[in-house]
Structure formats: C-alpha cells, structure tokens
Curated annotation (Swiss-Prot):
Pfam families: HrcA. InterPro entries: GAF-like_dom_sf, HrcA, HrcA_C, WH-like_DNA-bd_sf, WH_DNA-bd_sf, WHTH_transcript_rep_HrcA_IDD. Belongs to the HrcA family. NCBIfam families: hrcA (TIGR00331). Coiled coil: none annotated. This is Heat-inducible transcription repressor HrcA. One of its GO terms (molecular function) is DNA binding. Negative regulator of class I heat shock genes (grpE-dnaK-dnaJ and groELS operons). Prevents heat-shock induction of these operons. The gene is hrcA. Keywords: Repressor, Stress response, Transcription, Transcription regulation.
C-alpha cells in the first residue's frame, strides 16, 4: 500500500514524464509547487518507489521514469478525466455532420478524427458482417447483359456487385425475382442467406420464374459476403514522431507489428468488453508492442455491440486526454448509429 506522499510523488513523476519525455529527478520534483518536501525526503521516497517497482532508473540519466507497473497503477487509480476543448468537441461532431448512412464510412471517419485529435495511431474494427441482417436487395439493369446488385444490411453496410444477366432471363422476371428475395429474406442474418436461398427460396422461384436456375447461383454468390470485420487504420506513421521510437530497431519492430494486420485483428477482438480498456506494454502480448499502450472502447446500436475503436500510442501516452476523447467518440458513435439504424 502506497502512502499519500508516495502517491503524490508517483503521480507528479508520471505526469511530468508524459509531458516532457525526460527522466525526472528529485531536484526537479522539489521545485514543483504541489510538492512541499526537501530533495532528501523526495530521494528517499523515490528509492522506495523504485524498490517497489513503480519507477525505474535509465542508463543515461540520474532521473527516474515510470515502469509498466507504475503506469498501470497510474491508469487504475490516479487518473482524472480531462475536459475537452470546444475545438475537440466540434471535431468529434464533424464525424456525424453528413448523414452518410454507411456504417463503414462513419467508422472510418471516426478513426481519422481520433488520430487527428491525439496524434497517435487509431484503429477501428467495423461490425462483423456475419451478425448483420438483410434489409434490402435491389437489382438495377445496366444493359441487356449486366446489372448491378445492391445489398443493404440493417446496419447500413452496402455492397454493390456487377452481375451478368443471362440472355434467357427476361427483365420482368428479374423484377419478380427481386420481389421474392425481399419477401423471403429480409431480416435473415447474412451468414444464413446462401443456405436459405437454396433450401427455401429456390422452390418459390421455380414456381414463378422461367429459367430461374440460370440466375440462382449468381444471386447466391452475390449474397456470399465476407464475414470478417474490416479494420481501418489512421495515422500509421504518427508513432514515428514519438521520441521513444527514434531507435531504428524499435521503429522496425513497431511497423512490422502494425503491418501484421491479422495479429492486430486478433488482439482487438480480445478487447470486446464494454467500456474503456487499457493495456500497457507487455500486457498486449504482441511482439513489437513492448513500448506501446493500447486503449480501446466498443460502440453499439442500441444494446447490440458492433465493433471496437482504439488508440495505439507509446506507454508515455497522454492517458487522461486519450481516454476522454475515445470515450466521447464511442458514446457519440453509438448514439448516432442507434438513431440512424435501430428503427429503420
């Protein structure tokens, strides 16, 4: 159990190191107005904090820097929310200024604004398409041989696919087919569509449409949408501006980790609990992230959790600011998406 004096010194050390990136010494601490202690007393307390594993000495300086344990304690017990500026709030609102009605585009724009506001790397994991349900199918003829099939889900995901229309299929039959598909498939999870077409809808099509079989496979393939979530990055190179990554080996390790999108995808999938989650350094259990922290939040439509947004930064991250911004974006994103899609 840390004493009040140790808590104060630990908080000031971490705040100062986050701000400056420079190791913090007892002399510098003694000049802080929050700390009315002598350099000798501060040195003794710092020695205890070091022995307890909350701070550590660097080779190049007599000052101390926070350890992973120190950052963890700081995030769990010492942080207070940071007030957002009006400029911050306006930038967040700009995500939703256009009524895009395309969930992927809104999520992608959220990632960009998060990166702009924090100067770190942001990642957004889109909704798992397999969890979406079909809202509407349209087939619009382009000419006698081709048409565009438009698939719209209940969460605004839109897929356009150019298809070949066999010469044996009459335009009026195409319209009938679309009506039957919408009657039978609206509200069906995308993961079940292909199976349902062959097992249930095919018999209805056979009764009403000549040469239905020539279009059946084309439509079924069109509805076979990839089911993994899409992952969007913004500000991939922002981390290179951090002094921690001036070392070329650390840069290589970091960039390799970011480029390994499958590993990063699996990492984000683990961060699917509601609320803000912070993992620091080696807690991330991913090579290349030893000097990084990851802060994540989930977003939803109503009570249905859809995806994850995250900020990747150095362990010397502005935790208070980033958590406040991420929490606001996740909350606003959930509110707006619920308003747009839940009742449609």
């Amino acid at each position: 159990m840390l004493t009040d004096r140790q808590l104060l010194i630990l908080q000031v050390i971490i705040d100062d190191f986050i701000r400056s990136g420079q190791p913090v010494g007892s002399r510098a601490l003694s000049k802080k107005h929050e700390i009315s202690l002598s350099s000798a007393t501060i040195r003794n307390e710092m020695a205890d904090l070091e022995e307890l594993g909350y701070i550590e000495k660097t080779h190049a300086s007599s000052g101390r820097v926070p350890s992973e344990k120190g950052y963890r304690y700081y995030v769990d017990h010492l942080l207070s929310p940071q007030r957002l500026t009006q400029e911050d709030i306006q930038k967040i609102k700009s995500i939703f200024a256009e009524r895009i009605y395309d969930l992927e585009k809104v999520v992608q724009k959220s990632a960009q604004i998060l990166s702009d506001l924090t100067n770190y790397t942001s990642i957004a994991l889109g909704p798992a398409v397999k969890d979406n349900k079909l809202k509407r199918i349209q087939i619009i003829p382009l000419n006698k041989q081709t048409a565009v099939a438009i698939i719209v889900t209940d969460t605004g995901h839109v897929k356009n696919h150019v298809i070949t229309v066999p010469a044996s299929v009459d335009p009026s039959d195409l319209e009938k087919m679309v009506n039957i598909l919408n009657e039978r498939l609206i509200g069906v999870p995308l993961i079940d569509l292909k199976d349902k077409i062959y097992k249930e809808v095919a018999d209805v099509l056979r009764m009403h449409i000549h040469n239905y079989d020539s279009m059946l496979k084309t439509i079924a393939d069109t509805l076979d949408i990839p089911q993994e979530e899409k992952m969007f990055f913004a500000g991939k190179t922002n981390m290179l501006n951090q002094p921690e990554f001036s070392d070329i080996q650390k840069v290589r390790s970091l960039m390799k980790m970011i480029e390994q999108e499958k590993d990063f995808y699996r990492l984000l999938r683990k961060h699917n609990r509601k609320g803000i989650q912070v993992t620091i350094g080696r807690e991330n259990q991913l090579s290349g992230m030893e000097n990084c922290s990851l802060i994540t939040a989930t977003y939803s439509i109503g009570k249905e959790q859809l995806g994850t947004i995250a900020i990747l930064g150095p362990t010397r991250m502005e935790y208070s600011r980033v958590i406040t911004i991420l929490n606001r974006v996740a909350s606003d994103l959930s509110t707006v998406l619920t308003k747009w899609y839940q009742n449609n």
